[in-house]
């Protein structure tokens, strides 16, 4: 009997510890980071594998430019604005289908601003004046959703379950329910020069998350509004409330103002740092930032409670040139990145024997753009 009691106590204690660890891992409300405490980081400290995707090239699926790319499981979704075409490939490069419905008909779009793919692979294409074109996971047209004119413009779309979130450059958010057509509008902040709410929203599991402009807060977007989820704490390098107020009163929107974000971030400037994007995977919480006139990466390992802070990896990789989606950073060749701040992302050291495949594809002017997937550790 004593032996059974003893074993029962051990098992219960073990389960209690496991539950506590999971609770700590999943409910960190404030991630504290010292931006000056840099970490020598290899790309292989963060990734399980790297895939070079040779996108199939034929007349039916030629890509002029990649304006947006997303990944869901083993499928890549690409929007080519130059051709007003949406293309779908497997992650091994094989071609699946193309949507090219530009026109003036009732089931045709005139211009696509952004797209989102649901958990089931359904595709939602957004026009900047508020029309959504919904397609099946095979690329078959299903319906056109005409939103009410409640936003200045409709610039980004994110879909989860029956929820559609629209982000406007004006600083507003529209929540739309697919199930009953109801909607709610929420105001984020006043429109400002240089600082925009675009590319600040990400999807983690079933949640649509948004990072605030200046105070490092991560919000979950719901039908009730923005609910605080967690935040970054950069200690002495947090932006002060006083400086944020000074800045927001100084840069009210003026379309003729030519200032850029880096005019306001850095030593002697209103902001000490600025988060371009914050995203989350099963293993990491990630911030891609501007700090001391340079790009900075912050990776917080939720499992090991370890922080990685670096400008570049040991292999010279910079994830600021990538798109994050589905536990993966996606790199694709963009002409502007080659000379922009002397950025280098792809080296022989990280690709190994796949480097020749990459360079051959890159140098082949007749092939589709090269796509590389950095699969983060689970």
Give the predicted meaning of each segment:
Residues 59, 100-108, 147-153, 189-194, ...:
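Short coil/turn segments at the loop-to-beta-strand junctions that recur within blades
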Residues 65-68, 110-114, 150-159, 193-201, ...:
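Repeated scaffold domains used in trafficking and secretory/extracellular systems
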Residues 230-246, 303-327, 333, 339-340:
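Conserved blade-ending motifs and adjacent loop-strand segments that build the rim/top face
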Residues 56-60, 94-120, 127:
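Blade-loop segments of beta-propeller domains
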């Amino acid at each position: 009997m004593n032996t059974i009691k003893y074993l029962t106590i051990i098992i219960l204690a073990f389960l209690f510890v496991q539950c506590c660890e999971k609770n700590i891992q999943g409910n960190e409300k404030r991630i504290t980071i010292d931006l000056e405490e840099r970490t020598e980081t290899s790309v292989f400290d963060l990734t399980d594998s790297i895939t070079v995707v040779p996108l199939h090239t034929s007349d039916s699926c030629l890509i002029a430019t990649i304006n947006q790319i997303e990944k869901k499981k083993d499928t890549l979704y690409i929007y080519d604005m130059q051709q007003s075409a949406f293309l779908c490939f497997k992650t091994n490069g094989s071609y699946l289908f193309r949507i090219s419905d530009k026109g003036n008909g009732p089931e045709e779009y005139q211009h696509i601003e952004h797209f989102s793919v649901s958990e089931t692979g359904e595709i939602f294409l957004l026009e900047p004046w508020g029309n959504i074109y919904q397609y099946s996971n095979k690329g078959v047209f299903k319906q056109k959703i005409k939103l009410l004119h409640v936003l200045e413009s409709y610039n980004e779309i994110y879909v989860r379950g029956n929820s559609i979130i629209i982000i406007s450059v004006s600083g507003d958010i529209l929540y739309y329910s697919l199930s009953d057509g109801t909607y709610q509008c929420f105001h984020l902040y006043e429109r400002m020069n240089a600082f925009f709410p675009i590319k600040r929203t990400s999807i983690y599991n079933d949640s649509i998350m948004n990072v605030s402009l200046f105070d490092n807060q991560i919000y979950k977007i719901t039908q009730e509004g923005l609910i605080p989820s967690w935040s970054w704490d950069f200690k002495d390098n947090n932006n002060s409330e006083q400086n944020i107020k000074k800045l927001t009163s100084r840069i009210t929107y003026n379309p003729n103002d030519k200032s850029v974000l880096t005019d306001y971030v850095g030593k002697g400037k209103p902001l000490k740092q600025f988060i371009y994007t914050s995203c989350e995977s099963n293993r990491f919480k990630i911030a891609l930032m501007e700090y001391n006139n340079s790009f900075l990466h912050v990776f917080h390992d939720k499992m090991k409670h370890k922080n990685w802070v670096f400008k570049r990896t040991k292999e010279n990789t910079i994830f600021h040139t990538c798109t994050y989606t589905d536990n993966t950073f996606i790199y694709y060749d963009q002409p502007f990145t080659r000379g922009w701040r002397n950025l280098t992302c792809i080296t022989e050291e990280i690709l190994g024997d796949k480097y020749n495949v990459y360079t051959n594809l890159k140098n082949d002017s007749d092939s589709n753009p090269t796509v590389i997937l950095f699969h983060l550790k689970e």
